[in-house]
């Protein structure tokens, strides 16, 4: 029974860490969304390979194990891919809002 309790304790700890990871992933994603808005205003591309390489280099240099550098790289490549996708979605949604507002303004003036 004590070994089962030990496993349960570790699983509880993993669940706590998972909750924190989800919170941090969402916080990171919100930052990416804000960056996407800024890029849109400045006319910059969403995809920034130089920055993505910097992020990968940063996180792999921080790694002390037991994950190896390749595992950390793969994890963050996925995180970055998802952030880029969300940036793009939000950027397109913002562009659609602007288009809708412009159309509404034009319709208002045409109908007056």
What are these regions (language model features)?
Residues 1-112:
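Domain-level signature for soluble enzymes in the chorismate/prephenate branch of the shikimate pathway
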């Amino acid at each position: 029974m004590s070994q089962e309790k030990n496993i349960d304790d570790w699983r509880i700890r993993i669940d706590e860490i998972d909750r924190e990871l989800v919170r941090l992933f969402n916080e990171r994603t919100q930052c990416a969304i804000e960056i996407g808005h800024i890029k849109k205003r400045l006319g910059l591309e969403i995809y920034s390979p130089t920055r993505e390489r910097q992020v990968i280099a940063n996180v792999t240099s921080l790694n002390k194990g037991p994950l190896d550098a390749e595992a950390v790289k793969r994890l963050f490549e996925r995180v970055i891919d998802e952030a880029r996708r969300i940036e793009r979605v939000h950027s397109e949604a913002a562009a659609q809002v602007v288009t809708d507002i412009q159309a509404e303004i034009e319709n208002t003036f045409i109908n007056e």
